[in-house]
Swiss-Prot record:
Any one annotated GO CC term: nucleus
Region ranges (Disordered): 455-511
Organism this protein belongs to: Aspergillus oryzae (strain ATCC 42149 / RIB 40) (Yellow koji mold)
Assembly with partners or alone: Component of the HAT-B complex composed of at least hat1 and hat2. The HAT-B complex binds to histone H4 tail.
Protein's name in the database: Histone acetyltransferase type B catalytic subunit
Amino acid sequence: MASEGDWTCDANDAVQITLVQPGEQKPKTLSSFHPQFTYPIFGDDETIFGYKGLIIRLRFAAHDLRPHIHISYDEKFKTVGDTSAVDLIKTLSPFIPEEAFSTLPDYENAVQEDKDAKDFVPPGKLVHNYVTRGRTYEIWAASLADPQVRRLLDRAQVFVSLFIEAGTPLETEDPEWTLERWTVYFVYEKVKPPTPTASQYSIVGYATTYRWWFYQRDSPEKGTVTNDPFPGPEIRPAQLPARLRIAQFLILPPHQGSGHGTHLYTTIHTACFNDSTIVELTVEDPNEAFDALRDTADFHILRPEFLKHNVNINPDPYAELSKKQRPRRVPTSALIPTKLLHDIRSTYKIASTQFAHVLEMFLLGEIPTKNRHAGGANMSRLLVKKYNATDPNERRYYWWRMLVKQRLFKRSRDILIQLEMSDRIEKLEETVTNVEEGYEALIKVFTAREEALMAKQEESGESPETAVLEDSVASSSDSSTRDQRTKRKFTVEDEDEEEEGESEVSKRPKV
């Protein structure tokens, strides 16, 4: 009898995902790729027992994601006692729509003969379009309360389990008032239809966002007592002040590295910026790749505003104070224009922790490289001289590190106060160095992108926005950038703040 290993295969290799569109005689493959992981379906080991030569092919119509699953194998394990091959249909059924289990001829015929395909338009409203590398793309936004959106999303739900770590598919059968809180953004490429009846749209990716009610403690408007009729008028979720949270965010593998993620993120940010009821934009449990994308996109958004107001670190916050008068704490308001920065953050609706990351990265970039750790700054001398260093840029760098340490201490105070003072100082020093390394990597990426943009503008006269956005996702997926970001995230826990007592319902999907 063959060993168990002979009957076990890698689930990630066995599953093949294919996007198809009508061809001359049968559906034509547009792209084919494997999942990033399959543990939500096949367990932590991501293996399938009981088959040799197993192929699980998931096909999706490129425009409306009409699904089909086809399973083939060379040999199946015969049950011995309690040991049997994995029941693939039973295992896959919770993750794939029932319509996917039709016969292959029926599916191919449905794709070939779909008379509605040529008139297909993504649901919702066209909110952004752009051209990248000579190809045209569109982003559409629609409410989850729209039945067409729910149908399309239900077909795409399996992507959550295959590409979004710790992701949970959305519950699309909730009451309408709950569904209205959700907006789904679809990214499509406009392609040349291969046949007269084929669609001109091909899916690229999508994102889901939802509104989370935001309690405003200090409302400028004082309520007045009136004799209004009871019951009062109906209040919809869209009328209430809210945080907007990005829940799921996915660009399919064939389209990654081409800037679509940044276009999608900035489109969501623009919608947030233009909605007077949205207070700020946040992200649920972002991974390192998305963190890098978000940082570079927000840096691109905020940097012109920082430059416009000459935001920088004051190297002499104690200029008018004697040594006895100097406070023991970091003089934040004397170092940076806190009121101005608060106004900028509120205007652009960036979450406070994310804004701090972008601000710190900008301030670091304003210090000459030779005065930074990455440029060979004399750290021993800085440790001795501190804010008394002769060079004002050395003083700026000293105060930059102190500002970062102050933020990190506030965020992780409960953990750090349990350490001895020497260990606490060592931990903060280590963490701020890791944070700085992460920022240096992102600054390097952004600087290279800006230089490429300038060259591209000179050659073709292309708009700055388009040229910058094309390169951003490729940059965010750079392995060294991800490594640096990982250091920053796990040395000291530093996440977007959440309201205490938040229900699990609000955190169903994970990015």
